[in-house]
């Protein structure tokens, strides 16, 4: 079998259906793929000989009767997913069946390092994760690398980032591939996390899905009509750089003015609180030796008046922006970053009210909203999933 797992279109079709609906019977594969029984049987036989599939006596997820269910063989191999940011690196090992085999993280000030130092640190971390995964069954299939900015996935180049200075046109995939001797896929945070949510958190992959990331940046990962949306230059979903209406537009690290990220992301709410504290506003935050966005959200959840005011204003802007994306894309499922929940149930409900009042009734009635779990490795998982997805394509 070739480095990819699907050297023919038929094998790719069968593998992707098994990925999405496993454990699944041959008859259900015929219904799902539109292939003939003979074509499905030949494909399954080929993939079974290569030990890419396993077959168990299970209740089929697509049929009520008990039958033999086909699934991807987790022991065939594994993928690494690595996400880096201004404050550190995280890595995860997922097998072919999306089972988590291990994870590591390191806190390091990447934001304060030079470009060459960052590249070396990321490549070295990748090598350490690979070494830590050697005991996993099968072989390492490759690495999915998740960058906090805008990327050119085709060339494996980090184009720019509002969160990392001097991070322009960096051939980071080549550096990691050379260090580890493996194929590397590069993708942005938004698309990585929507893939992570779609495969790791939802009961079944969604047909139309939005994932809203909220942290140092703000991004929107999209899956529409069953396909992940990356845009013509792989930079779709930059929700944080939507211009918001404000009388005093703040400068954004992207070079623009009035970006949502500059007014409502975690660093922005920290800055707002610091300005208010400097003007002698009362708050439980006034005695903090250092202040971060999570602390502001948690203070708001404890009904601190300053934190609550700042967070509600930020969520007003974020909720309005989310509603705009919902109006344009009409998704079935909207998943919100679990970080929103740190502000407490009352402010979380305020965010939902903002989204609802700015959304068309027909769109709202069709929408299922949930909050993501607090798994810090969600982006890493999406990177590993993306790497495996690429191997299932013809």
Question: What is the predicted function of each stretch?
Answer:
Residues 103-105, 112-118, 167-168, 172-301:
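Glycine/GP-enriched mid-protein hinge/lid loop-to-helix segment characteristic of carbohydrate kinases
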Residues 100-208, 346-357:
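Glycine-rich phosphate-binding loop and adjoining helix at the ATP-binding site
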Residues 150-153, 191-194, 219-220, 229, ...:
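Short, active-site-adjacent cap segments at secondary-structure transitions
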Residues 95, 153, 223:
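Short, acidic, Ser/Thr-enriched surface-loop or helix-capping motifs
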Residues 1-56, 62-66, 71-107, 111-139, ...:
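ATP-binding/phosphotransfer module of carbohydrate and carboxylate kinases, centering on a glycine-rich
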């Amino acid at each position: 079998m070739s480095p990819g797992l699907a050297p023919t279109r038929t094998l790719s079709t069968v593998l992707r259906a098994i990925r999405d609906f496993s454990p699944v019977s041959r008859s259900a594969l015929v219904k799902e793929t539109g292939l003939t029984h003979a074509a499905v049987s030949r494909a399954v036989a080929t993939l079974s000989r290569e030990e890419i599939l396993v077959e168990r006596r299970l209740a089929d997820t697509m049929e009520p009767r008990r039958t033999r269910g086909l699934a991807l063989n987790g022991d065939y191999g594994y993928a690494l997913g690595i996400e880096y940011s201004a404050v550190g690196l995280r890595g995860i090992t997922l097998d072919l069946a999306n089972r988590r085999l291990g994870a590591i993280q390191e806190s390091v000030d990447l934001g304060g390092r030079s470009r060459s130092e960052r590249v070396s640190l990321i490549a070295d971390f990748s090598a350490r994760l690979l070494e830590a995964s050697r005991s996993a069954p099968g072989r390492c299939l490759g690495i999915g690398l998740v960058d906090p900015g805008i990327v050119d996935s085709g060339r494996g180049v980090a184009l720019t980032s509002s969160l990392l200075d001097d991070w322009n046109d960096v051939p980071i995939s080549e550096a990691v591939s050379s260090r580890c001797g493996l194929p590397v896929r590069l993708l942005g945070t938004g698309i990585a996390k929507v893939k992570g949510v779609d495969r790791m958190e939802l009961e079944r992959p969604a047909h139309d899905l939005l994932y809203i990331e909220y942290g140092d940046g703000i991004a929107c990962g999209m899956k529409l009509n069953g396909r992940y949306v990356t845009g013509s230059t792989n930079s779709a979903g930059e929700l944080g750089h939507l211009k918001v209406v404000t009388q005093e537009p703040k400068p954004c690290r992207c070079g623009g003015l009035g970006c949502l990220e500059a007014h409502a992301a975690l660093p922005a709410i920290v800055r707002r609180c610091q300005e208010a504290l400097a003007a002698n506003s009362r708050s439980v935050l006034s005695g903090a030796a250092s202040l971060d966005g999570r602390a502001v959200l948690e203070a708001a959840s404890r009904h601190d008046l300053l934190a609550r005011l700042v967070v509600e204003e930020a969520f007003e802007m974020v909720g309005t922006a989310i509603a705009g994306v919902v109006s344009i894309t009409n998704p079935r499922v909207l998943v919100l970053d679990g970080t929103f929940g740190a502000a407490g149930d009352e402010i979380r409900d305020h965010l939902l009210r903002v989204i609802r009042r700015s959304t068309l009734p027909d769109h709202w009635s069709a929408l299922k909203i949930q909050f993501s779990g607090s798994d810090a490795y969600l982006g890493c998982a999406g990177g590993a999933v993306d790497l495996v997805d690429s191997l299932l394509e013809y």
